Amino acid sequence: MKTRYTIASALLAGVGIGAVAVQSLHAQTNRPVYLVTEIDVTDPGAYATEYAPKVQASVKAAGGRIIALGGTGGAGAKFVTQVEGQPPKRVVIPVWDSLQKMQAWRSSDDNREARKIGDQYAKFRSYAVDGL
């Protein structure tokens, strides 16, 4: 009887430890993701009035937060400071809870509609960087 109790206790402890380990691994895969977008604006007025408000609203609606905005003109943006190499004219960095959430936003109807407008007034270069 005592052996059965010991085996049952060990099995229960193993399941508990395994569950904690799986939860920990899952948490590590859901790191924040930063979407770095370098922008060369060709029509600042139209970009600021037609594109920027739409894309900013779509980021917010999809759970992203814009944490950095730099470059010439628009929405209180500060200048991009050259450290090494030639800096882009404008940079926007939103952060997302996960790569999946960022990708869902990128393929959303709101973002696609905004991007059609943005492509008329700017050229974009974007890449995602995992957070720690």
Feature roles, as predicted:
Residues 1, 64, 89, 121-124:
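A signal for specific C-terminal beta-sheet/loop modules enriched in small/flexible residues
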Residues 110-116:
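A common structural junction motif
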Residues 5, 14-107, 130-132:
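Short S/T/G/P-rich N-terminal loop/turn motif that feeds into the first structured element of a domain
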Residues 1-11:
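Bacterial N-terminal signal peptides that target proteins for export
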Residues 8-10, 112, 121:
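A periodicity- and composition-biased signal for non-globular, repetitive helical segments
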